[in-house]
Amino acid sequence: MKTAVIASLIAGAAAFAPAKNAARTSVATNMAFEDELGAQPPLGFFDPLGLVADGDQEKFDRLRYVEIKHGRISMLAVVGYLVQEAGVRLPGTIDYSGKTFAEIPKFAAFKEIPAGGLVQLLFFIGVLESSVMRDLTGEAEFVGDFRNGAIDFGWDTFDEETQFKKRAIELNQGRAAQMGILAFMVHEQLGVSLLPQ
């Protein structure tokens, strides 16, 4: 865990280091994704590693799918962390030895959960990956659209501009949640709470 803290400190320090001469990407290549969802102020289209410098739309869509998925998971993780920090825990015990859910720490839980519980978690994640968090029907309107013709929640009642804004909001909140859950993890390892006591 100390390694994770040190790595995050190095990454933070690297953000303020002088820029190195990186491989130049042409303006035309960057323009291919300049109007895509997520190219928003203050950064605009941001690809410092040149992952989509070749203008490959399929690669861009795959990376966007991964970003949306991790953003959604991070939003759930932040809410889960805050709920646990507020003292809300499941009642009862997690195993036959009598260990209660309240005794299990937040991020150190993987060391405390019985092997059978971890197998259940991995199975559940596999079910989500294979049958829920993907476009099964081929009817997706955009990358990350997992409605699969089953649920809508009124999405189709919005005009195209409102849908674009809502997708941009989700993407930004997912990005913020990824940074937020990382901050919670680092501060827990440091023994410092980000939340008021």
Swiss-Prot record:
The chain crosses the membrane at residues 73-94, 113-133, 174-196. The keyword Plastid applies. Residues 1-31 form a transit peptide. Gene3D superfamilies: Chlorophyll a/b binding protein domain (1.10.3460.10). GO terms for molecular function: chlorophyll binding. It is a multi-pass membrane protein. GO terms for cellular component: chloroplast thylakoid membrane; light-harvesting complex; photosystem II. Its main location: plastid. One of its GO terms (biological process) is photosynthesis, light harvesting. Keywords: Chlorophyll, Chloroplast, Chromophore, Light-harvesting polypeptide, Membrane, Photosynthesis, Photosystem II, Plastid, Thylakoid, Transit peptide, Transmembrane, Transmembrane helix. The LHC complex of chromophytic algae is composed of fucoxanthin, chlorophyll A and C bound non-covalently by fucoxanthin chlorophyll proteins (FCPs). The ratio of the pigments in LHC; fucoxanthin: chlorophyll C: chlorophyll A; (0.6-1): (0.1-0.3): (1). The light-harvesting complex (LHC) functions as a light receptor, it captures and delivers excitation energy to photosystems with which it is closely associated. Energy is transferred from the carotenoid and chlorophyll C (or B) to chlorophyll A and the photosynthetic reaction centers where it is used to synthesize ATP and reducing power. Belongs to the fucoxanthin chlorophyll protein family. PANTHER family: CHLOROPHYLL A/B BINDING PROTEIN (PTHR21649). This is Fucoxanthin-chlorophyll a-c binding protein C, chloroplastic. It comes from Phaeodactylum tricornutum (Diatom).
